């Protein structure tokens, strides 16, 4: 009887170890996805800043042209 209980316990331990290993793999995948998402965020923030600067430059250029029209 106790041998049967030990066999059951061993099987449960094996299942628990397998579950832990699968969860560890899933955690690693999620960490990789998180890192990729973080890189994408940084790239988008950089692009956003560049576009804001470009927009500002165009606004200044248009103001300058409008100022020249006012002087004519």
Curated annotation (Swiss-Prot):
Non-essential, abundant cell division factor that is required for proper Z-ring formation. It is recruited early to the divisome by direct interaction with FtsZ, stimulating Z-ring assembly and thereby promoting cell division earlier in the cell cycle. Its recruitment to the Z-ring requires functional FtsA or ZipA. GO terms for cellular component: cytoplasm. It comes from Haemophilus influenzae (strain ATCC 51907 / DSM 11121 / KW20 / Rd). Homodimer. The ends of the coiled-coil dimer bind to each other, forming polymers. Interacts with FtsZ. This is Cell division protein ZapB. It holds the Pfam family ZapB. One of its GO terms (biological process) is FtsZ-dependent cytokinesis. The lineage of its organism: Bacteria, Pseudomonadati, Pseudomonadota, Gammaproteobacteria, Pasteurellales. It is found in: Cytoplasm. InterPro entries: Cell_div_ZapB. Residues 1-71 form a coiled coil. Keywords: Cell cycle, Cell division, Coiled coil, Cytoplasm, Septation. Belongs to the ZapB family. Its main location: cytoplasm. It comes from the Bacteria. The keyword Cell cycle applies.
